[in-house]
Amino acid sequence: MRKPTFSIGGVHPHDSKISRECRVEPMPLPDSAYIAVAQHIGAPAKPIVAVGDKVKVGQPIAEPGGFVSAFIHASVSGTVKSIAPRADLAGNPVMTIEIAREGDEWMEGIDLSDTLVTEIPDDNKAILDKIRLGGIVGLGGATFPTHVKLSPPPGSKCERLIINGCECEPYLTSDFRCLLEKGEQVVIGAAILKQVLGGVPCTVAIEENKPEAIAHIGEVIARLRKQSPKFDGIEVMVMKMRYPQGGEKQLIDAVMHRQVGSGALPISVGAVVQNVGTALAVYDAVLKNKPLVDNTLTVTGECFPHQANLLVRVGTPLRAILEHLGGIPDEAVKVISGGPMMGKAVANLDAATLKGTSALLLLTEKQTARGEEGPCIRCGKCAEACPMGLEPFLLQKLSRIGDVEALEANAAQDCIECGCCLYSCPANIPLLDIIRLGKADAMKAIRERAAAAKAAAEAAK
């Protein structure tokens, strides 16, 4: 039987899941946590603490800066040492709250026990409030505030919840370990999300290269169904191994056979997609009163002798993580935050983890070497590989000459930055790097036009 997958494009990089057998281990607490106020899509959070304040783990330290924004909490207990710009992994200044750790004292009311809670409250408004107050964001890469995603605009209706367990990015295994080690919590979190969305059907999508997770989640669902009807309507769907199967729009295409239009949101076709890590965080927030103060990330690479999946407090310096695992080996010449397809090079190892940090990948000179760039030979391989149906060879040309109007007309803003074009190019053209710049220009033009239209409408009132 053919396994479902998306309809256009895609590539088949080696999965390189060399850390898949590494159980999640807690990372030792950092001496200081550096917690950025901009670590989600939307407006940065606004600090609500001052230098010298004493804080506990789980205490709110920054509040949402707008409708699309999220609470941020102290990930360690101690004293607020500074609130100032600090370099992120690219070296850019980001407003950051520094907390010097003193012990590990948590806010009252947070349940840190291993006791599994299966009873889901009926009050959806209270559930949404806990998700909002817990600072829960999407942990599949986009870090979109979850409470906003669960509140569709008027006229929109969710028809299916998709829990994304594909983890198609090579090397990453934190979601796989989450499914194996916290499968019950993930399914309960999915049931909570399902209830908030009106009891819609729920599909847990897992790629075929994770048979242990597929079997385990199936068993968990069957067991929980016997306890409560709230777990009815949740199913596992085994997906074809293909990159980027875990892309939001690609997953909707594969599961629901619906295409999200240019500039549209998944809810426009009746879909809401949440990552397995987000489902786990929702369980913690709603049933354990635990805000999002830590996340699991993979540390890996063929040149790295100490493969690991670590539970890391938000704001832990990247350098501390690597030193905990023995330091950077001599043959490693580059550290990537994320995977090899969509990740970004780390220019500053003193940068700290964010809520959405998924991996640290160490690469050798041979792995990072790019062939000499040649001229485009018009082979069309990049267009064949693009899962969004774009023409990367054209977009890179328009980006080079700075034609923003043409970039927008050719849907540069729809690029999901998956890297399939770069992976497929025989001329070694850095398509993704160039298109990213053009996409940023197109998005800026779209935002400026929307702001101008809004201002004109306000003035006309």
What are these regions (language model features)?
Residues G199-L318, H324-E331, G339:
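Hydrophobic alpha-helical positions that pack around
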Residues G78-V80:
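Conserved hydrophobic positions within beta-strands
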Residues M1-I48, E98:
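N-terminal, Lys/Arg-enriched amphipathic/low-complexity engagement segments
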Residues A87-F144, G155, P211:
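Acidic low-complexity segments
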Residues M107, G138, L161-D175, C303:
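Gly-rich Lys/Arg/Thr-decorated short loops/hinges at beta-loop-alpha junctions or inter-strand turns
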Residues A50-E63, S82:
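Short, well-structured beta-strand-loop connectors
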Residues L180-V196:
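Histidine-anchored nucleotide/phosphate-binding helix
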Residues T357-E373, A383, P387-K461:
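Ferredoxin-type iron-sulfur electron-transfer modules in oxidoreductases and energy-metabolism complexes
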